Amino acid sequence: MKDTVGITALVPPELIYACGKRPLDVNNVVPGSSSSPASKLCAWTAVWRDMILSGELDIDSLVVVAGGDCHNALVDGQKAELSGKPTHYFFYPFDGDTDYFRSQLEKLSLFLGGVQDDGIITRITDLKSRGKALDEQRVNDRARASDVFSALISFSDLAGDLDAFERTLDSIPEADVEYTSRVALIGVPPIYPDFHEVAEGFGLHIVYDELPYEFIRLGGCDLDSLARNYTKYSFAGPIETRVWFIQDELRQRRVDGVIHYTQFACHHTLEDEIFRQHLDYPILTVQGDLPRPSSEQLKLRLEAFAEMLEVMP
């Protein structure tokens, strides 16, 4: 059985699979948890940290994205390392330096034991093409946002099993989507497992999930192309570049409004003011904490936002 490599944020899954390992995005188990960590800032990292320390999350090693995304993961990842878990620290360059990032990929490859099957990258590229087609179906009102989101969020690790993941993609149905407004969801993904279904219930069709879209947008066929493409990971670079990219997606997807999800104790919360200054759309900002079903307060806010968008000219 292949060794399981936990990843704390986006790490090119192409390279992990090519090294003969099985990636597991530790964040993807968090929304389904009922945990209430005693020691936490961000619940996302605290939940997976406790699951690793207790053995509930069975991984052979851990890759911590220590530069270019989540800051809390750096400390919680070190706690996992101090418990004896083999751990590697992975850094995205803020300035997009391709040579630097290629060196990061080379170091990661060494940690993982070296490339064994680079041909598997072609299959991952094909699966990502299917993900893009699925995303396009959603934009064209031919797939439910909740179905598409559950698929796209899994592209960070392709569910650790390419065959099973392909079957999952096969099972997503086409649907005629009825809604009152088209919205974008920016920021980190909601920690609430039912968020998309709740939004759909109020007539909000989420046609853009910012972070999961990065998982299918970026790719490559070898170290050089992976380095070139993944340095464009929007969450790891200047906020100005990210705003420009979001603006372009909002225009193409013809959105009526924007939901900015923020996580308690996450540095990305500080970006809300910037988005409000530069995105010329009605914006609803919501903040989550623990992994739980959507609260009644959140439902009321989503309902009010939907009603406001419906009456806007």
Indicate residue ranges for each PLM-predicted region.
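Trp/Phe/Arg-rich N-terminal binding region typifying the photolyase-homology
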Residues: M1-I120, H196-A199, V207-P313
